[in-house]
Amino acid sequence: MSFDIAKYPTLALVDSTQELRLLPKESLPKLCDELRRYLLDSVSRSSGHFASGLGTVELTVALHYVYNTPFDQLIWDVGHQAYPHKILTGRRDKIGTIRQKGGLHPFPWRGESEYDVLSVGHSSTSISAGIGIAVAAEKEGKNRRTVCVIGDGAITAGMAFEAMNHAGDIRPDMLVVLNDNEMSISENVGALNNHLAQLLSGKLYSSLREGGKKVFSGVPPIKELLKRTEEHIKGMVVPGTLFEELGFNYIGPVDGHDVLGLITTLKNMRDLKGPQFLHIMTKKGRGYEPAEKDPITFHAVPKFDPSSGCLPKSSGGLPSYSKIFGDWLCETAAKDNKLMAITPAMREGSGMVEFSRKFPDRYFDVAIAEQHAVTFAAGLAIGGYKPIVAIYSTFLQRAYDQVLHDVAIQKLPVLFAIDRAGIVGADGQTHQGAFDLSYLRCIPEMVIMTPSDENECRQMLYTGYHYNDGPSAVRYPRGNAVGVELTPLEKLPIGKGIVKCRGEKLAILNFGTLMPEAAKVAESLNATLVDMRFVKPLDEALILEMAASHEALVTVEENAIMGGAGSGVNEVLMAHRKPVSVLNIGLPDFFIPQGTQEEMRAELGLDATGMEAKIKAWLA
């Protein structure tokens, strides 16, 4: 969309942070209002992450106004909240392309802008990176400042606390801003907090604080009195704080929607030495009432009419694979009170809302703590329960050692329901489920299943749930199922595939939900089509049968070719000294950018047309 100068006259003056810093402070509330309206106008037309950005408008303006970005380095955790940052840093007119193929990256991205210091997408990385950047800046000696912005969800992760513990030890000059949008601010408490925050962050208080510590450090009774006095003053703002114990100078909480107050506090804190912590309170979805009332629904939105206040309803067609999983989970839990379900902050995305309501005592949202989720499941299994870890493929990477050390080595019966496997679409490189088959396949005695449709998905979940000799995994994609009939649940024979149709010369061995595309290719080329079902253990007898009765084999999977299911087929053939030619079709050896699933599959040759072209070129 073209930028309407008449509609956004103040925002029109700001196409860089240098231009922002030329504005008089008095114009900044108006700028924030226009920025929020422009964000609503843009995202409603193009889709994208929405509610988080509405909540960080004032913070973004204040940070870029006070700090000399991009020389001073501003780091956003996760990046859902960074749309206003992109708008103010030279990407205003392109914001309508965000998350689209060839458009702006969905998150801060180093290759996109010098203002994007750290490429992000996964949670809780900002403080660790910020410490490294601050240490490097200190050694550089150019008085470059470092600021990390992290949300109240992301800061619950262990990695964030590991980083803060380290910062308290080495004491780099840096600021961590906690964007806390869990509750709204009482006007009276907020006003008191803002006044005291400015007092406590001011030079006079800081000088007295540090000077007093030095003068009286050798006099234990006075040192203790000073400590208690300071704690009493701070108790008016917040009654004790973990962040002070970790070594940070804590200020807050303050109103994150008071842009002028934020500027005063940030200016006071800018020159303080050592690790600083500013706690701000914001409202997710601020300025757009429907998003304020339902920030979860409006977290990421499709195109919608902002005047209606409603998101478009789904067409009511085929269920998603997440819904298939959620329904199976409820069905199984109703029959077995040993079932326990775990998710690391992905209740809605993983299809677990209904389960959490029906079985609240068997539902565990452990927050953004993938490592804990897996080892917690191990403990439940040791205790005689049947844990299921529902997790996105890209986030299971964060708990790899726990899968190995705490589950697999001990042969514990934990079922991993791996959602968002394969190409996920608009979230791009950081969220593609490209690697799970590769990193799980090498784990001894792990059972790994790849359903070709929703009925197989249910049967495999049932099979994995009743597998008691070790861990198992079922991986399924983002998006809708294909519409096959759901049959009664029964256990599948472990490690056995099935031949779907017989052809000549060429056999296609399919792993997973690319089956409809593979079926079209098999029909066009008169090829045998096999639903392999299991990546581990592989159906070696079936692979050898196909090798003996065909001139060439093709493997198909929506996972990295390197180390994936096709690599496993190659290993079987080489181990048995079978000289048959094999073409492995899957995800290539680079990080796949954003675009719709259909766009990226077509570009990568993973639709029927692309597969057939690859096979014909290979056979020529």
Curated annotation (Swiss-Prot):
Thiamine diphosphate binds at residues 80, 121-123, 153-154, 181, 288, 370. Keywords: Isoprene biosynthesis, Magnesium, Metal-binding, Thiamine biosynthesis, Thiamine pyrophosphate, Transferase. Pathway: Metabolic intermediate biosynthesis; 1-deoxy-D-xylulose 5-phosphate biosynthesis; 1-deoxy-D-xylulose 5-phosphate from D-glyceraldehyde 3-phosphate and pyruvate: step 1/1. Its cofactor is Mg(2+); thiamine diphosphate. It is an enzyme of class 2 (transferase). It catalyses: D-glyceraldehyde 3-phosphate + pyruvate + H(+) = 1-deoxy-D-xylulose 5-phosphate + CO2. PANTHER family: 1-D-DEOXYXYLULOSE 5-PHOSPHATE SYNTHASE-RELATED, 1-DEOXY-D-XYLULOSE-5-PHOSPHATE SYNTHASE, CHLOROPLASTIC. Homodimer. HAMAP family: DXP_synth. This is 1-deoxy-D-xylulose-5-phosphate synthase. It comes from Escherichia coli O6:K15:H31 (strain 536 / UPEC).
